[in-house]
């Protein structure tokens, strides 16, 4: 092996290691508490303390009841929003589970939609949302 190729390979490895570790900050070794106090810019005594408060069983029951009330009110609101006037049935329409291939008219049921399978060779009207 040529000496210059060996020297270039060593230099390449050194540069790779230097590039990998150059972004890391140097570690400071603190010898005692005095150097810690002099080096730190923030005084630890000035920071507010953190207090942890345990919840009692009564407060947990109240929050659970409130959550259940919120859930029930949301369900009632969603049921009220769903109720909407249905469109009158048009005479030329396809019944539920009937064939609705693209030249056919729309489905009779207002909540039904035409679903096709096998590259639009088999199409039928199906109700997707039962609570519509």
Curated annotation (Swiss-Prot):
The record's disulfide annotation reads 93-108, 100-114, 107-125, 111-132, 116-123
The cross-references to PROSITE patterns, in alphabetical order and at most eight, read:
AGOUTI_1, AGOUTI_2
Q: Which GO terms describe its molecular function?
A: melanocortin receptor binding; neuropeptide hormone activity
Principal localisation: secreted
Write down the glycosylated positions: 39
| Compartment(s) | Secreted
Look up keyword Ribosomal protein and say if it applies: no
State the PANTHER family in the record.
Answer: AGOUTI RELATED, AGOUTI-SIGNALING PROTEIN
Q: What is known of its domains?
A: The presence of a 'disulfide through disulfide knot' structurally defines this protein as a knottin.
Query: What is the recorded name of this protein?
Result: Agouti-signaling protein
Q: Its gene? A: ASIP
């Amino acid at each position: 092996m040529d000496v210059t190729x060996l020297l270039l390979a060593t230099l390449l490895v050194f540069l790779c290691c230097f590039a990998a570790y150059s972004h890391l900050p140097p570690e400071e070794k603190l010898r005692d508490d005095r150097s810690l106090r002099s080096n730190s810019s923030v005084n630890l005594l000035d920071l507010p303390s953190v207090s942890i408060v345990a919840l009692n069983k009564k407060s947990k029951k109240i929050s659970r009841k409130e959550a259940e009330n919120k859930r029930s009110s949301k369900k009632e609101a969603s049921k009220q929003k769903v109720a909407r006037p249905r469109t009158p049935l048009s005479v030329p329409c396809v019944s539920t589970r009937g064939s609705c291939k693209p030249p056919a008219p729309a489905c009779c049921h207002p909540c039904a939609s035409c679903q096709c399978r096998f590259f639009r060779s088999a199409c039928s009207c199906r109700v997707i949302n039962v609570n519509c």
